[in-house]
Amino acid sequence: MKKEKAVVVFSGGQDSTTCLFWAIEQFAEVEAVTFNYNQRHKLEIDCAVEIAKELGIKHTVLDMSLLNQLAPNALTRTDMEITHEEGELPSTFVDGRNLLFLSFAAVLAKQVGARHIVTGVCETDFSGYPDCRDVFVKSLNVTLNLSMDYPFVIHTPLMWIDKAETWKLSDELGAFEFVREKTLTCYNGIIGDGCGECPACQLRKAGLDTYLQEREGASN
């Protein structure tokens, strides 16, 4: 893969930034694509733009505002509370989001001569999102190849690792402090360690605390 090109689906969050660093190490050339779907915090897009600029990565922002029109949710509507009732999908789930993002990333990838697509979806910290499952990604990979007659390969470096292991991967890639300080995971739009209260921040912090304990234990 060292001689090939990849497109990374990039939000500016912890997971996709870790995947961006992973792709930079794995591929000869990397581009990033970010989707503007009228997310709750425009800072998310600004964050992605700044990270790509700092890393010298060619970056495309695509207008996907129609997604909010089709599937209103707590990620795009400030009047909707972020909730997750047992047995139901979280209010942050956006129907069709990863299906559309990966499909448009594939169109872009083919246009720029890349066959590798990298995404940070993960089953281990599964939040009930059906489009984060490995079976979905594998199925879509086949569908995209057939639909465009092109040998795409969708890579999911985080699929089988939890948040602590994601922090470990960023550390192994030499990007731990960068990811911790410059990414935006928080649903309330606070860069870095975030608000500490929303579900995304709690998951991120729990993983970070676990990894730091493991790293400290290994060094003793």
UniProtKB/Swiss-Prot annotation:
It is an enzyme of class 6 (ligase). Pfam families: QueC. Catalyzes the ATP-dependent conversion of 7-carboxy-7-deazaguanine (CDG) to 7-cyano-7-deazaguanine (preQ(0)). Binds 1 zinc ion per subunit. Belongs to the QueC family. It comes from Bacillus anthracis. It catalyses: 7-carboxy-7-deazaguanine + NH4(+) + ATP = 7-cyano-7-deazaguanine + ADP + phosphate + H2O + H(+). CDD domains: QueC-like (cd01995). ATP binds at residues 10-20. GO terms for biological process: queuosine biosynthetic process. GO terms for molecular function: ATP binding; ligase activity, forming carbon-nitrogen bonds; zinc ion binding. Its cofactor is Zn(2+). Homodimer. InterPro entries: QueC, Rossmann-like_a/b/a_fold. This is 7-cyano-7-deazaguanine synthase. Its EC number is 6.3.4.20. Pathway: Purine metabolism; 7-cyano-7-deazaguanine biosynthesis. Keywords: ATP-binding, Ligase, Metal-binding, Nucleotide-binding, Queuosine biosynthesis, Zinc. Zn(2+) binds at residues 186, 195, 198, 201. The gene is queC.
